[in-house]
Design a protein with these regions (language model features):
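Beta-strand/loop-rich accessory regions of lumenal/periplasmic or secreted enzymes
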Residues: 1-140
């Protein structure tokens, strides 16, 4: 096992400007993610088990089209991606098309995961809210 942590960041800080643009900012083993504005109002996703997520000011298509970070224009909108698992970009770096190492490849033929989406406000305790959502799903 490992220690569970609670982390805070900004959408802007989730982007890393690799020399050659690629997907970035993916978080794994996540129980919930809350995206809020400066007033604390926003959207929360709570996984029924765990999930992966990224939150960026760019879509996957925009990242794929750009060769270098300076070609990207950050949008005010946030693109939230929720995944069960990703293969990743592969290899030992982000700029060559090497195959992902065997130990990092997903092997199950089918993956299933669930999550609950809902609003969150500054009055909510995100951890307690996520637990209550997860408990209500588990009871069904």
């Amino acid at each position: 096992g490992t220690t569970v942590g609670k982390w805070e960041s900004t959408v802007t800080d989730n982007f890393f400007p690799y020399v050659q643009t690629s997907e970035t900012g993916n978080h794994v083993g996540v129980r919930y993610v809350a995206l809020t504005d400066e007033t604390g109002f926003g959207l929360m996703a709570a996984a029924t088990e765990t999930m992966e997520f990224s939150a960026l000011h760019y879509t996957a298509e925009e990242l794929d089209r750009a060769v270098h970070p300076y070609e990207l224009q950050a949008e005010a909108d946030t693109t939230l991606r929720l995944n069960a698992i990703q293969l990743g970009v592969g290899g030992d770096d982000g700029w060559t098309r090497l195959v992902t190492h065997e130990q990092y490849r997903p092997h199950a033929p089918v993956y299933r995961y669930g999550f609950i989406l809902g609003a969150i406000t500054s009055d909510d305790d995100a951890t307690a809210l996520a637990r209550s959502w997860q408990t209500s799903v588990a009871a069904k």
